[in-house]
Swiss-Prot record:
SUPFAM superfamilies: beta-beta-alpha zinc fingers (SSF57667). Coiled coil: none annotated. Residues 80-96 have a biased composition (Acidic residues). The gene is ZAT4. This is Zinc finger protein ZAT4. A zinc finger (C2H2-type) spans 4-26, 194-216, 243-265. One of its GO terms (cellular component) is nucleus. It is found in: Nucleus. GO terms for biological process: regulation of DNA-templated transcription. It holds the Pfam family zf-C2H2_6. Keywords: Metal-binding, Nucleus, Repeat, Transcription, Transcription regulation, Zinc, Zinc-finger. Probable transcription factor that may be involved in stress responses. It comes from Arabidopsis thaliana.
Length: 314
């Protein structure tokens, strides 16, 4: 019961319709009072004598205008409150009736009532509506332009950053590769083919070329080893001493064999100490001739034998 209560006389009513009829009576009385107040103000202005001083005229006009404005503002506020109460009561009644008749359409009716209430409220508080409507559109267009510009700028920056990152990655990959491999790759690559510089063979992929180069490296290693062995052998042969007998000019593989051979010459020389030098030379020549002769009855001597066979008849 407290909900349907008049704000002016504080009377309570059963429903909103009864309260609305009661509020209309208040509105009629208020409008009559407003007409009376405005009529009195006009009469006072007309009956005002013209011979008063300027100061008195100013003060009275200010007082009357201020009182008139105050009364008008008060009446406007009362009208707004009454109309707001009427709209609220009508909304409540329509909601209750719609819920009883058709509860499924409650949402749509509520939205319509809210829209009508907003429209009435805008009518009551109209103060340059065209300006109020035009300003948000201006702000929205500006915001749209700014957002589009920001998006375009962001896309440009992202594309630049991505390009820089790709460029840095490529530089890192190139730095990781050795200079030798990169030079070989560039020189060997011709029209999508990979050519070996040493033998001139062409391969379809860089991996095949790498395997082929490995074989070349192995061959080079073997060649270097054989060359080293040959050089060492030649140097060793040059460095070896020649063990040659000064008497019979026979060559021996070692100094020990040469020494034993010289002892044989010394024994012969010692046995013939009484002989002359010419005889000794003659004997040595005969020995050398005998050594040169080959006895077919004897087996052939081995080349690896360090000692030489001396055929003595004595």
């Amino acid at each position: 019961m407290e909900r349907y209560k008049c704000r002016f006389c504080f009377k309570s009513f059963i429903n909103g319709r009864a309260l609305g009829g009661h509020m209309r009576s208040h509105m009629l009385t208020l409008s009559a009072e407003r007409c009376v107040i405005t009529g009195e103000a006009e009469e006072e202005v007309e009956e005002r004598p013209s011979q008063l001083c300027d100061d008195d005229d100013d003060t009275e006009s200010d007082a009357s205008s201020s009182s008139g404005e105050f009364d008008n503002q008060k009446m406007n506020r009362l009208d707004d409150e009454l109309e707001f109460d009427f709209a609220e009561d009508d909304d409540v009644e329509s909601e209750t009736e719609s819920s009883r008749i058709n509860p499924t359409r409650r949402r749509s009716k509520r939205t319509r009532k809210l829209g009508s209430f907003d429209f009435d409220f805008e009518k009551l508080t109209t103060s340059q509506p065209s300006e109020l409507v035009a300003e948000p559109e201006h702000h929205s267009s500006a915001s749209d332009t700014t957002t589009e510009e920001d998006l375009a700028f962001c896309l440009i920056m992202l594309s630049r950053d991505k390009w820089k990152q790709q460029k840095k990655k490529k530089q890192r990959v190139e730095e990781d590769e050795t200079d030798h491999d990169s030079e070989d790759y560039k020189s060997s690559k011709s029209r999508g083919r990979f050519k070996c510089e040493t033998c001139g063979k062409v391969f379809k992929s860089y991996q095949a070329l790498g395997g082929h180069r490995a074989s070349h490296k192995k061959n080079k290693a073997c060649m270097t080893k054989t060359e080293q062995v040959e050089t060492e052998y030649v140097l060793g042969v040059k460095e070896k001493k020649v063990h040659e007998c000064p008497i019979c000019f026979r060559v021996f593989t070692s100094g020990q064999a040469l020494g034993g051979h010289k002892r044989s010459h010394g024994s012969n020389i010692g046995a013939g100490r009484g002989l002359s030098v010419s005889q000794i030379v003659q004997i040595e020549e005969e020995v050398s001739v005998k050594q040169r002769m080959i006895d077919l009855n004897l087996p052939a001597p081995n080349e690896e034998d360090e000692t030489s066979l001396v055929f003595d008849e004595w």
